[in-house]
A protein has these predicted regions:
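Canonical Radical SAM [4Fe-4S] cluster-binding loop centered on the CxxxCxxC motif
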Residues: 4-43
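Extended hydrophobic secondary-structure segments that form protein cores and membrane-embedded regions
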Residues: 5-7, 61-67, 95-100, 235-237
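Cysteine-centered iron-sulfur cluster-binding motifs in ferredoxin-type domains/subunits
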Residues: 10-17, 68-71, 259, 315-317, ...
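Radical SAM/AdoMet-radical enzyme domain recognition
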Residues: 45, 49-50, 54-63, 72-195
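Radical SAM enzyme [4Fe-4S]-AdoMet core and its adjacent flexible, acidic
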Residues: 133, 137-145, 152-254, 258, ...
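Short, ordered coil/turn segments that flank beta-strands lining enzyme active or ligand-binding pockets
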Residues: 267
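Flexible mid-to-C-terminal extensions adjoining Fe-S/redox cofactors in radical SAM and related proteins
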Residues: 278-376
Length: 376
């Protein structure tokens, strides 16, 4: 089965101190422009690329993540590309992408990404007041202007960009304003990610959102997108719904049947099944010692993957289960009636699907061969 790699060459090191970061507190922020520790060694990088290229993939997809991967110099990514070319079989297709906070994009790095066709995901939560409420620099300063400057450099270089917006207490009450602002910057690919974090007492953190807020946000964005932007703007979550309705496939983790779409490779070569579960108890092995297929075939990995379908009676009886598949296990909390675990976003998903599914289905019907329907 195809799988991608999410690589963390600097682990959780970052030049920002975003309040909602789920790695917050695990590593001290790296000094701006200073040396980075931890850092993926040349030996781990080569072992990772070589081992991955020995697996059978339709496309070899490597996602450079963090922390903040651009703390590393361009030469690191150039070495990665060189290794990919050296280790790949003739005709192999390779796709690189990088997820960045956008504050450290130089013209040189942008030109490199354009030349090697890196997809660049940039984190931007909306206008300055929304974005900077939780996304702050290491010294507490603003970050919005630096992100816009990075986006401008990427645009001039011709890099394909995907905007990733975290939906938090900062912007959840202003969905259309957030969406239209991102569009005004020229964004044609947008991904919304819910902020769901709990404290040690299992109380929702101040920056996090409730399921009902998530639902209202999605419905409002959908209404605006449906009126004005079908075919012009790709909202990842909407594409995910369409992929399920048209092709009966999952293109995202949250609505997949199993948690087995990718592996995480830490800076030291340790491998984990998911970025939300980088814990000693979930370690599958190390690229210096274990093959990827060995780790994917392990009982620990199979049990983790199968956990996606360990939902309770609430999910099993839900008409929308084929669309959300119980949501990401990270978001699951004990159901109030004790009938297993259900997503903290469940109420929002139900509201969203309940108000939009009919129109999604008409859009899907229009895309199916031999069917002609008015999506509106």
């Amino acid at each position: 089965m195809n799988f991608s790699l999410l690589l963390k060459p600097v682990s959780s090191a970052c030049n920002l101190t975003c309040r909602y970061c789920y790695y917050r507190g695990e590593e001290p922020p790296a000094a701006g422009g200073g040396s980075v520790s931890p850092r993926m060694s040349a030996a781990v990088l080569e072992a990772t690329v070589r081992a991955y290229m020995q697996t059978a993939q339709d496309v070899y997809t490597m996602v450079w993540h963090g922390g903040e991967p651009t703390l590393l110099p361009r030469s690191f990514f150039a070495q990665a590309v060189t290794l990919q070319k050296r280790c790949a079989a003739r005709g192999a297709r390779i796709a690189n992408s990088i997820q960045t906070n956008g504050t450290r994009i130089s013209d040189d790095l942008a030109a490199f990404m354009a030349h090697y066709r890196f997809l660049c995901g940039v984190s931007l939560d909306g206008p300055r007041q929304m974005h900077e409420r939780f996304r702050r620099a290491g010294a507490g300063g603003g970050t919005h202007a630096a992100v816009l400057a990075g986006l401008a450099r990427l645009s001039r270089a011709g890099v394909a960009v995907n905007i990733l917006a975290v939906v938090s207490a900062a912007n959840v009450g202003r969905p259309v304003e957030t969406y239209r602002y991102l569009k005004s910057l020229g964004a044609t690919h947008i991904q919304f990610v819910p902020c769901v974090e709990y404290d040690a007492r299992h109380k929702l953190r101040a920056h996090a959102i409730t399921g009902r807020q998530w639902g209202r946000f999605l419905v409002a964005v959908f209404e605006d997108w449906f009126r004005h932007d079908i075919g012009a703007v790709s909202v990842r979550l909407f594409e995910s719904v369409m992929a399920r309705l048209v092709h009966d496939i999952a293109i995202d983790c949250y609505n997949s049947a199993a948690c087995n779409r990718y592996l995480v490779v830490e800076h030291n070569g340790d491998v984990f099944p998911c970025d939300f579960f980088v814990r000693p108890s979930h370690k599958l092995g190390n690229v210096l010692e274990n093959a990827f297929e060995e780790m994917r075939g392990s009982e620990a990995y199979r049990n983790f993957a199968a956990g996606k379908q360990r939902w309770g009676a609430v999910c099993a009886a839900c008409e929308f289960l084929p669309l959300c598949m119980g949501d990401c296990p990270k978001y699951r909390i004990p159901a109030e009636n004790g009938a297993g675990r259900t997503s903290a976003l469940c109420a929002g998903w139900k509201a969203f699907y309940g108000q939009t599914l009919g129109r999604f289905q008409r859009l899907a019907d229009r895309l199916k061969p031999g069917v002609h329907a008015d999506p509106r």
